[in-house]
């Protein structure tokens, strides 16, 4: 039985947004060690190399939970590890972050290209735009966006752009289909970055995976952290006793 739950953060915002969720998961799952794993330095590394690096860094047979880009990396790592992964949970994480001809329920290419260009020209302005999008759909978006911006950790522009390129590159459709362990994928109903319309297509990738709507915004794991912690705990406890 796994003794660890690892949380992977999203692009640009660092580990702080996951801290409250981690504390609540600690309380809900006292039998597990909950740790937040910062994303690795993505500069100059392929997606395959990053997955291999995370495989070396993280405990074997742990539960993996990731937010947005962290969820995409967790999904790829779960498929890489297979039976050496206890289970997978993602929040606001699309199999393809950027739309493709065969995956339209994602961010349009033109929108992503314009955002990447903004970050290349003025990273601070790009982060401000990003936190506004993360907060869109929340009951109180302005305080939430200020909270996110205050602790954002995008690194330098080279690192930030490399992270965006990774978001555009990753395609986890095959990973979701191939991973045989427990999977819970949660999409926010009014997410401005990962459209909830992806839900039905995600369900078609793996009939054994659980794909649900949870929360309202891309940053819903902050404002609804207690409910999310309980949903995750219920899923893990069922998986451990299956």
Model regions and ranges:
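Conserved HGGG/HGGXW glycine-rich cap/lid loop of the alpha/beta-hydrolase fold
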Residues: 1-47
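Flexible "cap/lid" loop of the alpha/beta hydrolase fold
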Residues: 85-118, 159-162
């Amino acid at each position: 039985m796994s003794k660890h739950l690892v949380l992977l953060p999203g692009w640009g915002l660092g580990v702080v947004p996951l801290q409250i969720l981690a504390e609540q998961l600690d309380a809900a799952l006292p039998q597990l060690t909950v740790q937040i794993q910062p994303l690795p330095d993505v500069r100059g590394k392929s997606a395959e190399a990053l997955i291999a690096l995370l495989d070396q860094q993280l405990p074997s047979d742990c539960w993996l939970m990731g937010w947005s880009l962290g969820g995409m990396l967790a999904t790829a790592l779960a498929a890489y590890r297979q039976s050496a992964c206890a289970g997978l949970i993602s929040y606001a994480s699309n199999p393809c972050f950027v739309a493709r001809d065969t995956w339209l329920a994602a961010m349009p290419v033109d929108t992503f290209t314009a955002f990447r260009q903004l970050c290349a020209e003025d990273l601070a302005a790009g982060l401000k735009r990003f936190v506004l999008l993360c907060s869109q759909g929340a009951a109180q978006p302005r305080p939430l966006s200020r909270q996110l911006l205050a602790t954002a950790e995008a690194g330098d522009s080279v690192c930030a752009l490399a992270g965006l390129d990774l978001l555009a590159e990753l395609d986890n459709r095959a990973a979701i289909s191939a991973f045989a362990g427990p999977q819970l994928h949660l999409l926010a109903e009014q997410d401005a970055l990962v459209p909830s319309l992806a839900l039905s297509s995600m369900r078609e990738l793996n009939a054994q995976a659980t794909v649900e709507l949870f929360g309202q915004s891309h940053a819903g794991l902050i404002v609804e952290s207690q409910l999310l912690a309980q949903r995750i705990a219920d899923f893990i406890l069922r998986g451990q006793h299956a």
